Amino acid sequence: MDGSAHLRDPPGPAVLRWRLEDMHIIPGTSGSLALRICQFSAAIVSFSVMISAANFSSVTAFCFLVAAMVLQCMWSLSVATIEGYAMLVGRSLRDSPLLSLFAVGDWVTAVITFAGACASAGIAVLVGRDIHRGCDVNFCGRYAAAAGMAFLSWLLISTSFLFTFWLLATR
């Protein structure tokens, strides 16, 4: 014995390792395409609910949410189209230069969506609970629903960003 202690792994079953490439939610997969479609759907519902309120344009936060949802819809639909085309022709987006663009675009869109959702939710609470003008006149339910769908859209695009960034960081 030389006095050094070397530990060896005991023989046993192979250790299962989890790899990001095995996930079906990274760009260019059916899971990612479904996530993009869900992002688009949540954003379009938020947009539709907000513009259905007659006086949304009188509040800056609500106008910002509408603009953020338009950006979210355009971004999600564009990326979904690219991912759908890549799947159709059998091309992988894992090593594509578009991956950096997807990560930055998802991050920027997520930040703008979150800001719009927070601002709109804050104004909806202010109008509904603090000013006491009556929510029937002020469409508080619609404002809250639009903010809720915007938060859902933000959650979905944040998921896309995290997986895309993780894939970008590990390649």
Curated annotation (Swiss-Prot):
Keyword Transmembrane helix: yes
Membrane protein topology class: Multi-pass membrane protein
Stored Pfam families: CASP_dom (PF04535)
Sequence intervals crossing the membrane: 40-60, 62-82, 107-127, 149-169
Positions in the Extracellular compartment: 61, 128-148
Protein family: Belongs to the Casparian strip membrane proteins (CASP) family.
Subunit structure and binding partners: Homodimer and heterodimers.
Protein name (Swiss-Prot/TrEMBL): CASP-like protein 5A2
Originating organism: Pteridium aquilinum subsp. aquilinum (Bracken fern)
